[in-house]
Amino acid sequence: MTKHGKRIRSILKSYDFSKSYSLQEAIDILKQCPTVRFDQTVDVSIKLGIDPKKSDQQIRGSVSLPNGTGKTLRILVFAAGEKAKEALDAGADFVGSDDLVEKIKGGWVDFDVAVATPDMMREVGKLGKVLGPRNLMPTPKAGTVTTDVVKAIAELRKGKIEFKADRAGVCNAGVGKLSFDGQLLKENIEALCSALIKAKPPAAKGQYLVSFTVSSTMGPGISVDTRELMAS
């Protein structure tokens, strides 16, 4: 049997596919799975009881994970003049205005998150077909369209992430690294759940957190009991 096959078999023995676990149990299972040679990202996939086709049931926002993401972000800032200088001084990786717009039009997207000052959005808006599908478009709801670029950069460095329900009503997000202490991962996930619950549209009826799965990059998807998450 190959090393890969042994790893998969070991994972399959570690939990019951048909069962929903508490959040702590799910994290413990992931951390007990055979390791790989890199620090895996822990992801969550949350099916929401919304109709994303309706404008009053679309969900998008941001949340600051209390323990960060463990990821070093490449931050781009669309700004000019004094705001561009502030962004550079605050540690942004890429700062520019029309020059960056043209570069991105040419296909360059080698960054993880974009921030823009309001006066830049007229030009940045033209990049919708490039940035939109990659969830890189700055938005006021996510706090990435702002005059306070210094604050935005600091929050992103500390672990602020954006969440958004896709066309199927599913929200996917990275919530830390598998090397994190289990309690730190739990706190990050609870912070995301709290933000999602606060963002529940008034028009959404019935069960809101329909299903919840936590996984690692190379690990299994573990089903989590949504009743615990709604109560936390």
From Swiss-Prot:
Residue ranges the record marks as coiled coil: none
Molecular-function GO terms, alphabetical: rRNA binding; structural constituent of ribosome; tRNA binding
One Pfam family it belongs to: Ribosomal_L1
Gene Ontology annotations for the cellular component aspect, listed alphabetically: large ribosomal subunit
InterPro entries to which the protein is assigned, alphabetical: Ribosom_uL1_bac-type (IPR005878), Ribosomal_uL1 (IPR002143), Ribosomal_uL1-like (IPR023674), Ribosomal_uL1/biogenesis (IPR028364), Ribosomal_uL1_3-a/b-sand (IPR016095), Ribosomal_uL1_CS (IPR023673)
UniProt xrefs under PROSITE patterns: RIBOSOMAL_L1 (PS01199)
Family matches, as PANTHER family: 54S RIBOSOMAL PROTEIN L1, MITOCHONDRIAL, LARGE RIBOSOMAL SUBUNIT PROTEIN UL1M
NCBIfam families: rplA_bact
Family statement drawn from the similarity comment of this UniProt entry: Belongs to the universal ribosomal protein uL1 family.
Function (record text): Binds directly to 23S rRNA. The L1 stalk is quite mobile in the ribosome, and is involved in E site tRNA release. Protein L1 is also a translational repressor protein, it controls the translation of the L11 operon by binding to its mRNA.
Protein name (database record): Large ribosomal subunit protein uL1
Organism: Chlamydia felis (strain Fe/C-56) (Chlamydophila felis)
Gene assigned in the entry: rplA
